[in-house]
Design a protein with these regions (language model features):
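Rossmann-fold dehydrogenase core element
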Residues: 102-103, 118-135, 153-158
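Rossmann-like NAD(P)H-binding beta-loop-alpha module
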Residues: 140-155, 171
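Alpha-helix C-terminal capping/helix-to-coil transition sites in glycosyltransferase folds
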Residues: 8, 75-76, 80, 125
Length: 271
């Protein structure tokens, strides 16, 4: 009986070609993104969820065990996907380190500067995948925007507009800041982010990147990068039609990260 169970377990962690499947711990398993990821993984043959973590485990109806704390997880895993809350960053990093450096795919937004520094420091000894947006499309747009900024130089003003549903708490969005940081990294000199022109009664500075937030309805997520020059405007835009696309990116990242060594990885590795 024990041998039979063991063989069944071995079969469920290998795909039809005999390759080892990626075993995932899903933090935030009872949230909207958790449900998307659970459904997506159930349809794939290269990975499986072996355990979930969520404070609201009563809502968990999936076929895997769920816990209220990651410290309670005993199932062996190859990678952690986190779609929970910024406050859980430290416990997740500690757990990953204690388990021999399990890769962590961090998809949660709203980290403070101190938390970003914490995960960056952890990546020196642990494999960490961190992106403020798991969409392949938005990350391709980011690379295109960087290319445009290099070519256009300071002859074009840059403005970023982000739109989200009326339940989103943080503003500007993590993705808008990700875009701004990427653009600032390829510009000459220092860049200032301008969030509120109402408070600044002066002409626009060339060194500025304007960032504007819109909240309303059920908008999943829209981002525009505007390059405004003399007599011409170039706009790069991305519109998310469903949060499911973020689940696809997260699971692809998890499979990619399985077995990776220490370092800080992001979506540029998948673009």
């Amino acid at each position: 009986l024990h041998l039979s169970i063991r063989r069944q377990r071995q079969m469920c962690i290998r795909d039809r070609n005999g390759r080892k499947m990626t075993r995932i711990i899903l933090c935030g398993c009872c949230g909207k993104m958790g449900h998307f990821i659970t459904q997506l993984v159930s349809e794939r043959t290269d990975c499986e969820i072996v355990a979930g973590v969520d404070l609201n485990v009563n809502a968990q109806t999936a076929s895997y065990p769920a816990y209220t704390s990651i410290d309670q997880v005993t199932e062996a895993a190859d990678v952690i996907i986190d779609f929970s809350h910024p406050s859980l960053l430290t416990p997740i990093l500690h757990y990953a380190a204690e388990k021999g450096g399990i890769p962590a795919v961090l998809c949660t937004t709203g980290y403070t500067a101190e938390q970003t520094a914490e995960l960056t420091k952890a990546s020196e000894t642990q494999p960490i995948f961190y992106s403020r947006n798991m969409s392949l499309g938005i990350n391709l747009m980011l690379e295109l925007a960087k290319k445009a900024a290099k070519v256009l130089g300071d002859q074009f003003d840059i403005e970023i507009v982000e739109k989200h549903h009326n339940q989103k708490i943080d503003a500007p969005s993590g993705t808008a800041l990700m875009l701004a940081d990427a653009l600032a990294s390829v510009r000459d000199g220092e860049t200032q982010y301008m969030y509120d022109r109402h408070a600044q009664r002066k002409k626009r500075e060339k060194s500025e990147i304007g960032i504007h937030s819109v909240r309303g309805g059920t908008i999943v997520g829209e981002h525009e990068v505007i390059f405004a020059g003399n007599n011409e405007v170039i706009t790069l835009s991305h519109s998310a039609q469903s949060k499911e696309l973020f689940a696809v990116g997260a699971v692809n990242a998890a499979v990619f990260m399985s077995g990776k060594g220490p370092g800080l990885y992001d979506m540029s590795a998948l673009v």
